[in-house]
UniProtKB/Swiss-Prot annotation:
GO terms for MF: 2 iron, 2 sulfur cluster binding; 4 iron, 4 sulfur cluster binding; iron ion binding
Gene3D superfamilies: HesB-like domain
Subunit structure: Homodimer.
PROSITE patterns: HESB (PS01152)
Signal peptide range in chain numbering: none
InterPro entries in the record: FeS_biogenesis, FeS_cluster_insertion, FeS_cluster_insertion_CS, FeS_cluster_insertion_RrpA, HesB-like_dom_sf
Sorted UniProt keywords: Iron, Iron-sulfur, Metal-binding
Keyword Transmembrane helix attributed: no
Gene that specifies this protein: erpA
Protein's name in the database: Iron-sulfur cluster insertion protein ErpA
PANTHER family for this protein: IRON-SULFUR CLUSTER ASSEMBLY 2 HOMOLOG, MITOCHONDRIAL
Cofactor(s) for this UniProt protein: iron-sulfur cluster
Length: 116
């Protein structure tokens, strides 16, 4: 496990995302939870982003901590997410987590899948 604590992170876990995750974890009542962000095959562009709560930190996970909340990224997904922003938006389109990824060459219209 590699851990990065509030320095210049290879993945930007934004303030709004970390505070929303903190709120959701408090609602779950399980402080051992972390937010896992990972890449899976699929979607109209080849890869898609996925989010899940996880209470297990794996040996190959990159751990980014902000506001007492852990963001977990496995080593395979990490290579595609270096330089990305993991953010939370609450606007007229709704409330949702979003990834802005400078490594994505193309993205689908909904923004949930991409290619490199």
């Amino acid at each position: 496990m590699s851990e990065v604590v509030q320095s210049v992170d290879p993945i930007n876990f934004t303030e709004s995302a970390s505070l929303k995750v903190k709120e959701l974890i408090e609602e779950e009542g399980d402080n051992s939870l972390s937010l896992r962000v990972y890449i899976t095959g699929g979607g109209c562009s080849g890869f898609q982003y996925a989010f899940a709560f996880d209470n297990e930190i794996k040996e190959d996970d990159m751990v980014i901590t902000k506001n007492g909340v852990r963001l977990l990224v496995d080593s395979m997904s990490f290579q595609y997410l270096v330089g990305a922003d993991v953010d939370y938006k609450d606007d007229v389109e709704g409330a949702y987590f979003v990834i802005r990824n400078p490594n994505a060459k193309t993205t689908c219209g909904c923004g949930s899948s991409f290619s490199v």
